[in-house]
Amino acid sequence: MPISKLKPVSNLRPVNKLRKSYLLISAAMLATAAGNAYAQSTEPAPSSSSEARAIEVIQVTATKRVTTIRETPLAVTAFDQNALDDNHVLQLDDLQGTVPSLHIAQNGSQNTPMVYLRGIGSSDQTESGDPAVAFHVDGVYSARSQGASALMFDLEGAEILRGPQGTLFGRNATGGVVNLHTAKPNLDYFEANAEFTLGNYDRRATRAMVNLPLTDTLAIRVAAAVDKSDGVVDMAPGSAMGKKYGSTDLAAARFSALWQPNDNFDWFLSYENFIDQGTGHIPTVSGGSDRSAYIQEPGFNDFVIDSLRTRLNYNFDNGITVSYIGGYTDSSRESVWDRSWDENKYEWGGCVECDHEATQHELQLKNEDSARLQWMVGMFYFKENNSTIFDIVHPDVDYEGGSTPNPNLWSTYRQPDRGLKSNSIYAQSTYKLTDVFRISLGLRYTEDERWDRGGRNIMCPDVKRTENLPLNSDYVGLLDPDNLLNGLAPNKFLVQPGQCWVDTYNDTSPSWDKTTGMARLEWDFSPTVMLYSSYATGFKSGTIQDGGRYTGTGPFTQADLDAIIAGNNNDAAGTSAYVAPEENTSIELGLKGSFLDNTLQLFAALFTTEYTDLQVTSNVTTETGADLLRKTNAGKATINGLEVEAKWLVGSNGELNGTLSYLDAKYDEFLTTDSSYGADGIAFNPSAGNPNLPNLLDFSGNHLVQAPEFSMSLSYEHFFELSNGATVRPRLRASYSSEIWFDPANRGDRPEGFRDLPYAADIDRQDAYTKLDASLAYQPSAGNWSLEAFVNNLTDKAIKSDQGRWNSNPVPNYMWQSPRTFGVRVKVSFE
């Protein structure tokens, strides 16, 4: 079967238990909505002026079959390339405000979007953590969140699936899935286009594409994009000179080919190169300017991703299709990032060598879409390897100790071989009970293996930022008879003058397995209205963290290393260097309808999701008696919500789009330390001081981060035809969000006593805000070009994106969304 052209995608898959009262309320609401929908669908036909208009049919692959978005029984938002252009989407974080329950924050040092769907995401962007929203391009999974920073250009469609997707998409999709489908070569005709954008902050962007049929069976497509702009964070007086933080310097190119020798077989192959040389994002300290910071170390980033993706389909005469989806990704990063933003303290860190390699193989077998019993089975294999050298140069005095010298002037985190191997099998089927009822069942079994071989956290008394620690023969001998440490001291207590030592030994090799599943019932209430209910489970893989220490006073031998590794793998003893997986269960009720002769489209979803073994950070005591913050499975959370999407073709020339999201997302159980402010944060948490919880805080009942209770958007565009036949199209979009929390502590407006800083109000919260975007497009009556002027964040609203607190510095600071940006864009096409 030939590769189908896609437009958007869909999603869905929740997990665990649901409260009866919530189900009853949800069912009643959906029944009422369905009754109203049926009444609307039987109203008299609209006037002839609107009869000629209809909402475009969009196809998605959220079920790994091609279906229309209205017929897809999942909560999914989909865009084609034109819709992405209208919303000025070039990167994933540009989608914020257009998708229900989607919120995106920026991570400074990694220059990586942190994606949250329905209140679920991850702020850990390192090789030790996994995202909770899976990212796929042409069916190939990206394990590292950095892959989501790639440019979104020349696409057939972008699909955002909300809710756990544990059956068809597997691991690390507890929050949802983002599917990108690149534009495939077209065998039928030549086409080309180009786009040029100029804007403030010296914005210069170009995108271009050429599609070339070489024969009746072979076509190639070449696409490229470049996007550059100056930074948005000004250097405070006295800062080091260099590129401003917040600058953009992105480039990408893609070559793809499609070979279809007959109606039974097609082969798609693409190679993509992505380069990011922007400076990354940096927090600014509250009490000063939102857009300035004192910089001692200008940002530097050199991030390169090379990706190879392929898909082969063969259609047998009996209607069965076998598909192979393969992918290979190789990425490397070097970076430098200022970590202090303070003229009195000097600290920076970054990747000296951070390399990542991933391979995917997937084999899929399914029958034809028209069968009464549709079935699909598949096998999935994924492997990734990470090699990391990450250095931090610390200040010469302790933050909390005033003039106390800091003995750890330099630390380096060496993970020469940290990786993952995942194998899974899955099956899903849909049976047509009657002409209007369908039932679907699915299962997936996953085995995950992780490892860290030779990982070490190393501390040094003076700055030695080198890629390889030199061997010092003076330190090899009595303390290291087996030559395991290459001249390092085995711990801080045995260090000699000028010698570096191993702080933690991170070797570990945990493994897990999990079966996830789904069940769904669909009902075609009328020819244009579908109702569905679903139950689904999700699974997020366990993660590796820092391991144990050597506490001995004698020679460090292989037996000592073996004992540490045994402790790192001993979950029962509480000394493991890993965190077990988290799981969720979701129940969802949905409505998808088309009304008023397909000029009004309404989608709605009611859901509840319960999390167990939520991966959180807690306080533990090491074997040396020191208190450390470590990840652990110590939490539960429940998320109840409602999402609505609507599109209405108003009259003969207008279009109204809207989204609405309500989230009741709270921690049910969450005992932890204050991971952001330590002792300084105690005064701001009402749960502190509980005698039953010494050294712990109880965040149970607090709101999840990046999960506003209410968020909505509304956009309207109108087409005006001029006397010369040209078209002018103004467009206005408003997006609203209620308050957003950035820390589980939910401190909010508690400035008193916070190091006597009166501007510490809302230290972990963004108040409710409204953001406006506008554009005006011109299309001539004849010709192959168009012109558009646009402005985003029209009122230049200062909107916090995340809390950017680091290194025990008790001054609150924040990441920010983009300030007001504006520009013009010209598009030219050729056929």
Regions found by a protein language model. Give the residues of each.
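N-terminal Sec signal peptide and the immediately downstream disordered periplasmic leader
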Residues: 1-87, 93-98, 211, 263, ...
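C-terminal beta-signal and adjacent terminal beta-strands/loops
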Residues: 4, 733-752, 777-831
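Gram-negative outer-membrane beta-barrel transporters
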Residues: 41-42, 435-439, 601-610, 630-744, ...
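N-terminal periplasmic accessory domains that precede
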Residues: 92-93, 115-116, 136, 157-160, ...
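Short acidic/polar hinge/loop motifs at secondary-structure boundaries
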Residues: 126, 133, 138-164
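Transmembrane beta-barrel wall of Gram-negative outer-membrane proteins
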Residues: 191, 198-229, 233-278, 304-310, ...
